[in-house]
């Protein structure tokens, strides 16, 4: 969905509630339970309850309301957000060395997202299904199987798209937030003393009283803000104002009421700590609450899965991941895509996590490191944008960065305590993704440099061919070229081995711009290089999928008529061998060869009819 669509503000705001706030909106299922479960050495004590509630509330205010909604969301690329977008913006007006550091930060942030996304569906759905323990304790052995069944169904429907089901997301999530508010308000009315925790002094008192333990406990408090990156990442779908409006009018009040309602319940009945969320409800409402909670967690999981698809497409288009099959599940909305490989790899990982950890409390120990690590990187990148792109006063920007890091770094450091108890999981997955992305980017650059380091001038070659033309055959030949001024390998090999050339030759370059979309007016640039040679450069944004048939259609409108089924497409296929390298670079080279063998072939990437493609092989040492 885009704000360009002529929809009313209430409709867009409602849709944002259904998609953007799924993850953070299901955090009340487990956050306060993990804070006060006894793992930090104190039980359900009044000072601890007040301290945690104060910390949660002020984290929601500072991190979500101030940092992300007010500051970070100012940094957009044609309305789009996300950690890779922020990386791109931050590196626009900096030196090459600084840009390299910012790129590494952005890739680490993107990798952290991959690490955390395996945990989100598992902990969300398991937390909802665990409500069965309250309804029927004898069914506790069914929590893991039921969680797997629910998520299996969710991953299976991905290939059909979520357009139809997505229409239900908004009303379900709005109902969910109203239930959160209603349950919390009911409990607060019975024990209004809990509202004293709105005073930030209770958070300070908590640190003074519990000292070191209170710092470690921040690792549980951070569960209340998981999913905060979705606010920024989904900005392009809904716009800044609807996302902000949804937060301040519905989401923040509902979360606050529910957390404080759970606190009021615990002050009256400390034994409710086993599941304070579900015990807020009267007995007659437990089963309906269990059902709506399961639906809300499925929606939260769906938002995360869609986020992975979007991030993967962006990484592929920007050259950080190998090409893979991307299926559009909606003719109306370009953002609705399905990536089979990512879908099923994620599914397998989620199932393994559920079977291994068995309970959401165990998963909570793995949650937080990647989230807080991304928060630190977002602070650095966004303030870099403020200084370099917006030209804010450097001292003011420094104060903002210090303020952000004073919150982010303690949260990240506190979560490092979870490293051995589960935090290794997202870090390991994130590390793997970082290695994969940097390997593909660097080795691809090395390959292209190796292929073109001995290349001749394109203009000189065309002039030579026009002066002493080889045998010409009827028809049009299109040579795919990765760079504008470089002779395509396929063209050189065709001349070398076949010694013929078509009557009309088009050198086609498909380029990804640093923007989500490219206007149709700027889509295709045509340049006639000689009487028989043309250069066509087609530009796409990183949220768009290149399509050669569309390019030809636009060429026809510009006077260069081409028919797909009467054109031969020449492409080079590199057979790679590893040269002499140090052992660590040799390992990276082997990983690249593995990625290259499994990458989507160019004809499939650009939707070129297979019977019109001629691939010419060449051996390249890297």
From Swiss-Prot:
Transmembrane segments: 9-29, 49-69, 103-123, 137-157, 165-185, 213-233, 247-267, 276-296, 337-357, 363-383, 396-416, 419-439
One function term, GO molecular function aspect: potassium ion transmembrane transporter activity
Membrane topology: Multi-pass membrane protein
Annotated Gene Ontology cellular component terms: plasma membrane
InterPro entries: K+_transporter, K_trans_C, K_trans_N, Kup
Keywords: Cell inner membrane, Cell membrane, Ion transport, Membrane, Potassium, Potassium transport, Symport, Transmembrane, Transmembrane helix, Transport
Main location: membrane
Catalytically driven reaction(s): K(+)(in) + H(+)(in) = K(+)(out) + H(+)(out)
Superkingdom classification of source: Bacteria
Pfam families: K_trans (PF02705), K_trans_C (PF22776)
Subcellular locations according to the entry: Cell inner membrane
HAMAP family, A to Z: Kup (MF_01522)
Family as reported in the entry's similarity comment: Belongs to the HAK/KUP transporter (TC 2.A.72) family.
Function: Responsible for the low-affinity transport of potassium into the cell. Likely operates as a K(+):H(+) symporter.
PANTHER family: LOW AFFINITY POTASSIUM TRANSPORT SYSTEM PROTEIN KUP, OSMOTIC STRESS POTASSIUM TRANSPORTER
Protein name: Low affinity potassium transport system protein Kup
